[in-house]
């Protein structure tokens, strides 16, 4: 077969060697020289960081107030239990979030099989050990399982609801990716007289919730979708439409002095660079209470004055500050 020097080779041979139910080696050849590392590295990064899956994101354990606690009759401390929960391989069918319960007492090993499951929840590794109980031990907990992608630290899920969250609900850093290990090597390949070609060998292991071959297929699809925009790239760019800012309530552009607060409260706000009413309403009560010399009495005064104007703390303004609001104005407010 004669190939033009300007024509790129495309892989014609794909081999899948199943090592175990959760591990496989995928071989792709032939590739032009250098394309083995180009494709291998791109697929590896997608498999590690962008694959969707399910994981425990929150745990509530009876008698536990924080992760540094110890439970009587339980061999592991709370931190070890939380680490073990991260090893659960869970599949949700048709749901994005679910709450599961686990309850066990008496001497023995607590495993994933002890979790009470709904009909649309599946645990792939039921033998996974969560804790070990003594004869006087008992473990009761609620687990929140959610669907996500890649790795998500607990603090990235914090929201306004955190202030009302009951004590003892422990947030977990979650790895949603079903991929446990991914490595690739590039070997030499030959087509007729050409001996400088690449052969890509990907060694992939998952947690069992996703078949390794399907994981590669999904990663390749993600890469294809991201590159599709370049395929249709046109030289003539479309005119940019400049959207006008949404009209802002004029009262938000007025200085906080117009609220006629006490001198103490007004000075505290200015010390925190809060010059306009629009600046003030975006602050929360917790943030204001952290302001030096601003106590609960001043906070109550601020809330009452805002309420009389139909405003409140903790509001969100998408287009603040507006372009018409000059920094120089703040300096003279």
Curated annotation (Swiss-Prot):
Report which reactions are catalysed by this protein.
RNA(n) + a ribonucleoside 5'-triphosphate = RNA(n+1) + diphosphate
GO cellular component annotations of the record: cytoplasm; DNA-directed RNA polymerase complex
Q: Which GO terms describe its biological process?
A: DNA-templated transcription
Q: Which cysteines are joined by disulfide bonds?
A: none
> Which residue intervals make up region (Alpha N-terminal domain (alpha-NTD))?
1-234
Transit peptide keyword on record: no
EC no. given is: 2.7.7.6
Q: Mark the transmembrane ranges.
A: none
Query: Which major enzyme category is it?
Result: transferase
Q: NCBIfam families per the record?
A: PRK05182.1-2, PRK05182.2-5, rpoA
Job of this protein: DNA-dependent RNA polymerase catalyzes the transcription of DNA into RNA using the four ribonucleoside triphosphates as substrates.
What do we know about how this protein assembles, alone or with others? Homodimer. The RNAP catalytic core consists of 2 alpha, 1 beta, 1 beta' and 1 omega subunit. When a sigma factor is associated with the core the holoenzyme is formed, which can initiate transcription.
Query: How does the record comment on the protein's domains?
Result: The N-terminal domain is essential for RNAP assembly and basal transcription, whereas the C-terminal domain is involved in interaction with transcriptional regulators and with upstream promoter elements.
Q: Identify this protein by name.
A: DNA-directed RNA polymerase subunit alpha
**Origin organism of this chain?**
Pseudomonas fluorescens (strain Pf0-1)
């Amino acid at each position: 077969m004669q190939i033009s020097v300007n024509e790129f080779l495309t892989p014609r041979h794909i081999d899948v060697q199943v090592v175990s139910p959760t591990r496989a080696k995928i071989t792709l050849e032939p590739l032009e020289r250098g394309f083995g590392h180009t494709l291998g590295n791109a697929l590896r990064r997608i498999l590690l960081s962008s694959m969707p899956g399910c994981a425990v994101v929150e745990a509530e354990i009876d008698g536990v107030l924080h992760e540094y606690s110890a439970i009587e009759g339980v061999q592991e401390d709370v931190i070890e239990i939380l680490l073990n929960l991260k090893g659960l391989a869970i599949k949700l069918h048709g749901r994005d979030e679910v709450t599961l319960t686990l309850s066990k007492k008496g001497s023995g090993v607590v495993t994933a099989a002890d979790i009470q499951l709904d009909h649309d929840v599946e645990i792939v590794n039921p033998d996974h050990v969560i804790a070990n109980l003594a004869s006087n031990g008992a473990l009761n907990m609620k687990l929140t399982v959610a669907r996500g992608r890649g790795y998500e630290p607990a603090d990235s899920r914090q929201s306004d609801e955190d202030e009302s969250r009951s004590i003892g609900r422990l947030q977990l850093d979650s790895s949603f990716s079903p991929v446990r290990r991914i490595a690739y090597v590039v070997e030499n390949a030959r087509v007729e007289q050409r001996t400088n070609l690449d052969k890509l060998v990907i060694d992939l292991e998952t947690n069992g919730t996703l078949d390794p071959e399907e994981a590669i297929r999904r990663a390749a699809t993600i890469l294809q979708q991201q590159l599709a925009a370049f395929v249709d790239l046109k030289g003539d760019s479309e005119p940019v439409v400049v959207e006008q800012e949404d009209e802002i309530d004029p009262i938000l552009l007025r200085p906080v002095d117009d609220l006629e607060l006490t001198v103490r409260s007004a000075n505290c706000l200015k010390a925190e660079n809060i010059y306009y009413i629009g600046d003030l309403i975006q602050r929360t009560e917790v943030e204001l209470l952290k302001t030096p010399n601003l106590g609960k009495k001043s906070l109550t005064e601020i809330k009452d004055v805002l309420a009389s104007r139909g405003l409140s703390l903790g509001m969100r303004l998408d287009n603040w500050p507006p372009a018409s609001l000059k920094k120089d104005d703040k300096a003279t407010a």
